[in-house]
Regions:
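Bacterial N-terminal signal peptides
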Residues: 11-24
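N-terminal secretory signal peptides that target proteins for export/translocation
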Residues: 1-7
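Residue-level hotspots at or immediately adjacent to binding/recognition sites across diverse folds
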Residues: 27-368
Length: 368
């Protein structure tokens, strides 16, 4: 079984329908064709599998299967489809202002938009990403302190080149319109300092010797955090230039990672496991919830609290009350949810296996 079959199988098991279906859909047509085929305009696109949401100023942007990008200028009440040059599934999206944004996805694709998501251009794909990693691994081999590890990295990079663009990017984090980090399957990690015009591999600067899949990125000032499979957690103390692994509070995978203004870090993943750290990930406290269903996303709400959503559509928010790190927020929504965002009017917009939905439930006060 080749490497992409393995990652598809593992992600299907780990992420269930919201992320697993796009992985299978991505294999329905040759990857090269999908990289060169624009996303089809679909009248019912808002009911497609959608995996992530972002703000572009007052606009909302949703991304998902087969290159679908949807835009809303009325807090998620209506949506229209954008023009996208690829038809691979898109897994994550972020904008740094009303115009400038990026989306990442299958086949190692990175897209950029400079008009609020109306149009997109390809900045990187899996072919070029593999070549960049191989070039970097070879350049760093002669001066590496651990020659065995460096040689193994070169061999892995050569295999990535041979296998082609079959590995997805799964998360991204930009701090402005120039500086950003993207991560994905098999420890893929690339960084840009010029808005994506050029990218360089960061794989060698991340303490991830087993090549764990990386699912989420968060930032707290100069400190950056990455979370992934099998309990993988890492922190950067140099503004994202290098990462050191942290001692994990459990061995399951993390899919959601978020920080609060007061420095609290929340990591959540399989079977309802959630943990809170108040010391930059040096130690964690379990945050029990009443249902063993995997978490899929975490956001910071307008009142500064953190909101978690699981794959059954149940919502939980951080609490300032002692002994209750997470509190249920309303009844379960009854839909598999991959991503959640707070619209400008205070309502929640959710994306998932059945498309998009709005929840008219204003966020409660931070004192609760």
């Amino acid at each position: 079984m080749n490497r992409i079959c393995q990652v598809v199988g593992r992600l299907v098991w780990l992420m269930a329908l919201p992320l697993a279906l796009p992985l299978s859909l991505a294999q329905a047509a040759p990857v090269g064709d999908a990289l060169n085929t624009p996303a089809m305009l679909a009248p019912q696109a808002r009911h497609a599998v959608l995996l992530d949401l972002a703000h572009a100023g007052a606009r909302l942007v949703a991304v998902g299967e087969r290159g679908i990008v949807l835009l809303s200028d009325d807090n998620g009440m209506s949506w229209r489809q954008a023009v996208v040059p690829v038809s691979v599934s898109l897994t994550a999206v972020q904008f740094t202002d009303a115009n400038t944004g990026w989306a990442v996805g299958h086949a190692g694709v990175v897209l950029a938009s400079h008009d609020g998501g109306e149009h997109w251009n390809v900045q990187l794909d899996g072919v070029r990403a593999a070549q960049l990693e191989l070039q970097t691994a070879r350049q760093q081999l002669p001066t590496a302190t651990d020659q065995d590890a460096a040689a193994a990295r070169v061999q892995t990079a050569e295999r990535f080149v041979d296998e082609g663009p079959d590995k997805p990017f799964l998360a991204l984090k930009f701090i402005d319109d120039k500086h950003g980090l993207i991560v994905g399957a098999y420890g893929l990690a690339f960084q840009t300092e010029d808005g994506g015009r050029t990218w360089h591999s960061l794989i060698g600067q991340i303490d991830n010797p087993m090549g764990a899949h990386l699912y989420a990125i968060a930032r707290q000032g100069e400190h950056w955090f990455i979370a992934g499979e099998q309990g993988y957690l890492a922190r950067s103390d140099d503004a994202g230039q290098s990462f050191t692994s942290l001692e994990s509070p459990y061995a399951g995978s993390f899919f959601a990672l978020q920080t609060r203004d007061d420095g609290r870090l929340l990591a959540a993943g399989l079977k309802g496991n959630a943990f809170v750290s108040n010391d930059l990930g040096e130690s964690f406290e379990a945050a029990p919830v009443p249902m063993p269903i995997s978490f899929s996303d975490a956001i910071r709400t307008d009142d500064g609290q953190l909101l978690l959503v699981n794959q059954a559509g149940a919502l939980f928010r951080t609490s300032n009350q002692p002994g209750a790190l997470l509190k249920p927020y309303g009844p379960p929504l009854g839909m598999p949810v991959a991503s959640v965002i707070q619209a400008a009017d205070g309502t929640l917009v959710l994306a998932g296996f059945t498309g998009l939905a709005r929840v008219s439930a204003p966020i409660a006060t931070a004192s609760e």
